[in-house]
């Protein structure tokens, strides 16, 4: 522990109690801990990473804690069961996992296994996801486990789904477009099958935040009320109203305000009740996704948070639907939710190392000499004059003199050496002013530019585009923090820049209570470079948390940085074991994605080296070393070693 700094300070600084409870914390050694079951049994994350590296599992690395999945699933069902008991709701809850959140085999299979006691099912939104579900979801002889088919559907999709009903799956085809109904009925008649049909309603109620734009009357998916009535009339005319089983809606992926959920439940409840009164064979109400994750720990309706907990969510769904049904004397439906983000987000932690840093230049300038240029002397005078009374005025003077120096340099009146001298003094002014600023309770807006200039850049062994695409694409906030040295005071403020040759490959927005920070508090690196062969090398590890939903599957190959190493940890005999290791892409793998064959590339290079040998541009030893390195690189991880 450094003087005047403790792990309690780090806990408050990074808000880990807010977004991480009950799974993540900090131990006395200053390392992040993981409690996969949300109990007292804790793993030291830093020690875990070090042990994985000894197994030749290099960073960047994604660690999946299967027991967190199990715990999230159990908590969701516990909350729904408590709400059902509290409000005397005369029916049950049967959840489904939306496969689109994270389609990886180990995760889906784990959720199917953990979900068996709850009759927990799957939701699919495409033909490939349907193929996963049909082969993964066990047949539940009680018929309570749901397989819900959402998304746009063609004849192949619908025929496969209808035939799969005969295996024993409780499969419901949710109509998103009117034409899907007619194709479904045509196939059903041809195969002599009775379909189970649902309708997805476009509610007037809209979600908030980024995903709110995909809901409401202009939503991408779903049926308007007139279209739902068309479905009703079509089924009635064919004497198939008993096949209309489910009403589905979805008002967004991350609903931060409980008020929006209440409004949606009321609207959907009325639609459900009236369909029942009209004679439809309604049985299920699927409230979709939206159960939010508190990424910043503020517990507010900020877009990266939520102003409710899981029990509040369950209570409002159960109570709201019961009220609607009681008023109309309709038996309440089986409740269904597609809470993928809330189930999967916490179980994955992304670990990466810092490879270097770039801090604002500062070297104590030597006093100026009388013969130096007037602007350089003016900058020096400014530097010497800075104090707590005039620091704002001196900042403006320093900026003006620096701009004049650059102007004169551009017209050829100052030398490169003179410009360097002026910039050195300018940065010294900036550091002195910034030190004063940090001690003030209030800083004027015109000094914010200086604060931004004083932010360091930490270069990380990662591709944001591959491992955290939402941070780049939609400015999604994820908790990021060091996983060790948390008993030391962080002295640097930094943004994170990834390995890609793209200016968007950075993270420059970080969680804060009810706000977004432009920089992250980090520790000074203990190494000037990333030379891991140095016996005194000390790595600096950062973790990005709550990344278990969407990020892996949406990542892309920008600059051909491929999939990263993944490990699965699970509790076995009261000890946490490495359950699976999924090795990340090597260079040959990603080159094949873009249609290059490794053996062809090697042969081309061999020919080039032979030509170079003939022209005496290379020695035989050099050519063999080049070919050896080329072969080794093809088989190596796409990230820095």
Q: What do the PLM-derived regions correspond to, one by one?
A:
Residues 31, 39, 68, 102-104, ...:
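Short, glycine-/Ser/Thr-/acidic-enriched flexible segments
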Residues 1-32:
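Charged, compositionally biased N-terminal leader segments and the immediate start
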Residues 88-286, 293-296, 307-312, 320, ...:
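Active-site-proximal beta-alpha core segment in soluble small-molecule metabolic enzymes
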Residues 21, 26-103:
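Low-complexity, highly charged intrinsically disordered N-terminal segments
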Residues 59, 63, 85-90, 278-282, ...:
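Flexible, glycine/charged-enriched surface loops at secondary-structure junctions
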Residues 15, 316, 322-641:
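Charged (often Lys/Glu-rich) extended helix/loop segments that serve as interaction or gating elements
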Residues 84-88, 104-116, 327, 450, ...:
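A short acidic-Thr-Gly-centered motif at the start of a beta-strand
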Residues 67-75, 230, 267, 316:
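A non-catalytic, amphipathic alpha-helix used as a structural packing/dimerization or gating element
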